[in-house]
Amino acid sequence: TKLNTLTPNSQKIIGQMDGKLKMTTYVNLLDKYFWVGLPARVNEDLKLFEQYVRFKPDMEMEYVYYYDTPSVPAYQEEGNLTMEEQAKKMMKINDLNPKMFLTPEQIKAKIDLSGEHNRLVRELEYNGKKTFLRIFDDNMIFPTEAEISAALWTSLKSVSCRDMANVQ
């Protein structure tokens, strides 16, 4: 049905992508939205993008787990725990393997997420061009098709999202 497919404009954007599209989700264990990318929830998270994968089956998706100072903490800790102690506590509470998490130093060596306030964020990469796809502090939290397609269009054309109306 029409509800289960992408709009014609989104299909055009995906159709113009003849190279590899990679989406990396950076999950900060100490961010309030860390739960979105937890391993137990990855399949549910991937459903957000299943319509895109249908049109771009070679789309690569990766999850990178780390801990660092968040803009909005996952919880307010009483006491004076260090960031590492907070991370270890969250790993224990959520039954997560500590080996899967990069330290603040390790994540910073890989990518600078300070401009994203160390929040859960997705990075779309296409033909060497990268753009971020964010989650939101509203009732919906997750990006809609329009926002996902705008980010893809930005990766494809390296233009502002305002130009998306000019999809050819």
Summary of predicted features, one role per range:
Residues T1-Q168:
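Short, surface-exposed patches at the edges or C-terminal ends of soluble domains, predominantly
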